[in-house]
């Protein structure tokens, strides 16, 4: 998705429930659109975790588009890679930003994610001259947190199931 947006892909400003369902069921037809809808138009930003909607009629597609384009304005020269971190060929001295599934949550695609193996790999990359940043809520002992922000996470559209979490960057 990020590669497509970087190349000038025109993101939609509105996605209906019917469009959401069609795109979800036909991701292969337009991977950029599938990525945008899968995260930006899904409840809680969870990959196809249900069509995002609320009582106030928030336009999640427009909100996501604006946010993404604002972020991309400063990332035009970045190289985005989507894939298994264990299979990437990373040039020496790279800056790496990793956004793994949070520990003790559902992994991407519903698969179990090996958090311990991931952190070992990130430490190895850091030890071999890369600058590594990881978004998570927790890290192994000895890994420094360089930024954090508390926020409220909502598990249903009626906001009756909310809890506080702290997003961190290590």
Mark where each language-model region is.
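Class I S-adenosyl-L-methionine-dependent methyltransferase module
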Residues: 1-82, 86-87
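Class I S-adenosyl-L-methionine
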Residues: 78-97, 102-170
């Amino acid at each position: 998705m990020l590669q497509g947006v970087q190349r000038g892909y025109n993101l939609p400003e509105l996605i209906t429930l019917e469009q959401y369902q069609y795109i979800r069921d036909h991701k292969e037809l337009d991977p950029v659109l599938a990525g945008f809808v899968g995260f930006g138009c899904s409840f809680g930003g969870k990959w196809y975790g249900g069509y995002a909607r609320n009582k106030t009629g928030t336009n999640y597609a427009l909100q996501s588009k604006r946010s993404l384009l604002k972020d991309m304005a400063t990332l035009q020269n970045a190289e985005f890679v989507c894939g298994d971190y264990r299979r990437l060929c990373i040039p020496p001295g790279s800056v790496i930003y990793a956004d793994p599934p949070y520990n003790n949550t559902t992994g991407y695609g519903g698969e179990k994610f090996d958090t311990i193996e991931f952190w070992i790999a990130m430490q190895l990359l850091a030890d071999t001259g890369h600058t590594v940043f990881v978004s998570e809520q927790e890290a192994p002992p000895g890994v420094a947190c360089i930024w954090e922000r508390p926020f409220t996470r909502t598990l249903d559209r009626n906001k009756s199931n909310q809890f506080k979490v702290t997003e961190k960057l290590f």
